[in-house]
Amino acid sequence: MKIAMIGSGAAGSVFAAYLRKGGAELWLVDKYKAHMDKIAADGLVFRTPEGEEVLTGFHTSATAHDIGTMDMVILMVKATQTADVMADTMPCIGPETVVVSLQNGLGNDEVLAQFVETDRILYGSGLIGTELAGPGVCVSKPEKGIQMHFGAVHNNPKADAAGKALEACFQAGGCNASFDEDVRPYIWKKVIANSGYNGVSAVMRLKVKETFADPYGHDIVMHVWKEGCAVAQALGIGDLWPLMEKEEPNIVANLGNYYPSMAQDAVLHQRQTEISVLNGAIARYGERLGVPTPSNTVITKVISCIQNNYDKQYLG
């Protein structure tokens, strides 16, 4: 199976490593030239809790324009970049190519549907901590149990066959992936969790464990989660609150010492965040369904104001 990984940073490289170990032929597409050049010259160093190995045989490119038609294209760019990246990726997408989003947030499948038919779109999310330790070096910190869930936007023979093939390839490479008939509960669970610790930590400029340890921070996270669960239930996805309650100690244990990605974007690097597909998406769905989401709405507005005014902020 010929697969293009569009966006081969930390998560994209880790996912590609598992797929390469599972037997896929991989094209890594990323504008990070030093990373692509290092992989092309020396292979990809892949570190996991079990040890380190060097994986070879990758094709690398800064663009999808000249890599030929793929069997599958996996998007691993920031959700805010999906439309622009898809426009650039179309040269390698043929009439039978299956397009997969394993990105953060809600609505990526809707953006993909602007470019290809929904019967060949898969979407989902991973539960794997990842790191790019340097050019050509990626690190996987997998969760226990199933590490990745994905499914079809519309179940049909083509999408189901592609999903099962992707599941088998991930599993053969050591990633415990699951192709699910209805992937929405897993996507919403991750989005709700992210909207809590990511959004609140970004506003507070705190690590995850510090946000949860402070009674006010913890209270805000719980409000964000409860609103997200109410929206999910209104969509017919089910009651996710019991799952979120069980998830809290795992989040603190596994992510507690880190500034989450939104805090890194907003505080450390002054980059555009994914607020619009996390808290912002929950708020939009809530408005559409008549479900109040005051905490998610306020956090969305605060982060949006911050990222709209990086050049004007007082730095001391």
Regions found by a protein language model. Name each.
Residues 184-212, 216-229, 256:
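Active-site-proximal catalytic alpha-helix in oxidoreductases
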Residues 1, 71, 146:
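Nucleotide donor/acceptor-binding cores
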Residues 17, 21, 87-91, 114, ...:
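Short, well-ordered alpha-helices that flank and scaffold nucleotide-derived cofactor binding pockets
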Residues 1-52:
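NAD(P)+-binding Rossmann beta1-loop-alpha1 motif at the extreme N-terminus of oxidoreductases
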Residues 93, 137-152, 202-211, 259-268:
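Helix-loop-beta segment of a Rossmann-like dinucleotide-binding subdomain
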